[in-house]
Amino acid sequence: MLFARVVLFGCLGLGPVAGLRAAEERPAVARYTTKAAHDRDGIGKIYFGREIAQVMGHQGASWLERPERQTEERTDVLLDALALGPGEVVADIGAGSGYFSWRMAQKVGAQGVVYAVDIQQEMLDLLMSQMRRRQVGEIVRPVLGTVQDPKLPAESVDTILLVDVYHEFDFPYEMAQAMIRALKPGGRLVLVEYRGEDPAVPIKRLHKMTEAQVQRELAVHPVQFEKNIPTLPRQHILIFRKPRE
């Protein structure tokens, strides 16, 4: 949830702080529209009828590491659903504090690689400090991405994981294209998003997505929707796969 301009606790409504934007950001192309009167939790930029949400900044890292997160989100169940194996190459997009990077490193082991991608150097510095302390610094590789490109090697990754981050991309089309280029043939793109269909999920509206909306946005890219794993209490696990040929 941290692939970001600097905005503190955007999804909880705790108030934005002054933001930064990547230097290469270009004016919106035809696929995007804007509106001046927009949701206080959004940036006024519209994609497929959806307003893009504000993003949490590095000041919110402690919230990602809160002790109750596993109970609330059942992150252990998510990791089991991914079924990662030794030696796999995976990417954690919007890695933030490294909550999932560390856990995935334990799954892929010493022969595997975890690319921890974020656009905030401060977050990557914090993340790698924790990875070295947890003795997985040789497995987890920090990558400073941009708002349009995660900077991953082409056709190098088995699984790309995005946990509560896709809805905050300034350039969702460009990011999806770049991530798919980074996937090996047959690789998986996994989007975990709070369920927009469920009003009982206690998250701001713009920080949730329906399965239909995600499928609509990914349908324009060269991936195939595979399944929605309905095992989490609040979130979708949406699996897309890059064709093998």
Task: List PLM regions with ranges.
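Class I SAM-dependent methyltransferase SAM/SAH-binding core
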Residues: 91-150
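Core SAM-dependent methyltransferase catalytic element
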Residues: 226-245
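A short glycine-rich, Lys/Arg-flanked "PGG" loop and its adjoining helix->strand segment in the class I
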Residues: 105-106, 173-188
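Short glycine-dipeptide loop
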Residues: 87, 110-112, 183-189
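A short acidic, Gly/Pro-enriched loop at the edge of an enzyme's catalytic core
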Residues: 148-160
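A short SAM/SAH-binding and catalytic strip from SAM-dependent methyltransferases
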Residues: 157-173
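Conserved class I S-adenosyl-L-methionine
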Residues: 188-215
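Class I SAM-dependent transferase core
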Residues: 25-91
